[in-house]
């Protein structure tokens, strides 16, 4: 869809706290790593299967998953078996209980990383829906988030978030894919409409 932008790290491009991170795309090296790890391709070219869930009302996610399914099997021999939940509640139960291999979700970053991004990686939000669903835990990352949210100097805060983005991307905490644009439709007679999330809700 128009307006979608690729993401290479935890804070989306366009945010004042975004910093570029180095996430090289190297399928050849990925294949070498999988070979060394003891996952050879079988006669069908498949190394192993990963079951991947998604929130069933998010049709945009399903479209991306079908594309990734073809790309992963072709480039590195990993097959994604897409599992569709009967309803959003069933998906939520799987995610919060940890009964899944991988899940894909559309998360909203809000206007500040302390509100919208920290919850995705903080140890104390593990297993909470639309928060740290992967159960990721790193005390150093927790400390960086606390320092960044308390930092009053904008430049100092940006430096802390830059360090966080580099750390999280280096640890491959998630596979960040893209942004999803939101549109605000208004009558031309309505003036001074805020374009920030708390203004349009």
Predicted regions and their residues:
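Detector for C-terminal structural segments
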Residues: 1-22, 28-29, 60-70, 92-201
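Short helix-initiation/N-cap motifs at beta->coil->alpha
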Residues: 82-93
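Immediate post-signal peptide segment of exported/extracytoplasmic ligand-binding proteins
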Residues: 27-51
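Structural motif corresponding to the C-terminal cap of alpha-helices
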Residues: 37-41, 76, 152
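Short, well-ordered beta-strand elements
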Residues: 47-57, 80-83
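Surface-exposed patches in mature extracellular/periplasmic domains of secreted proteins
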Residues: 8, 42-45, 80-84, 156, ...
């Amino acid at each position: 869809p128009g307006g979608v932008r690729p993401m290479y790290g935890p804070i989306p491009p366009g945010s004042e706290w975004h910093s570029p991170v180095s996430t090289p795309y190297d399928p050849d090296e990925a294949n070498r790593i999988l070979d060394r790890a003891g996952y050879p391709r079988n006669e069908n070219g498949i190394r192993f299967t990963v079951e991947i869930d998604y929130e069933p009302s998010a049709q945009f996610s399903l479209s991306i998953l079908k594309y990734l399914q073809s790309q992963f099997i072709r480039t590195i021999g990993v097959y994604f078996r897409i599992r569709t939940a009967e309803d959003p509640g069933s998906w939520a139960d799987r995610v919060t209980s940890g009964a899944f291999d991988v899940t894909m979700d559309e998360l909203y970053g809000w206007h500040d990383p302390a509100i919208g991004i920290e919850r995705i990686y903080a140890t104390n939000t593990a297993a909470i829906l639309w928060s740290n669903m992967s159960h990721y835990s790193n005390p150093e990352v927790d400390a960086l988030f606390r320092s960044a949210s308390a930092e009053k100097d904008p430049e100092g805060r940006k430096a802390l978030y830059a360090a966080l983005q580099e750390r999280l991307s280096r640890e491959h905490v998630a596979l960040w894919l893209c942004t999803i644009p939101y549109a605000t439709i208004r009558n031309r007679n309505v003036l001074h409409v805020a374009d920030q999330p708390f203004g349009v809700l």
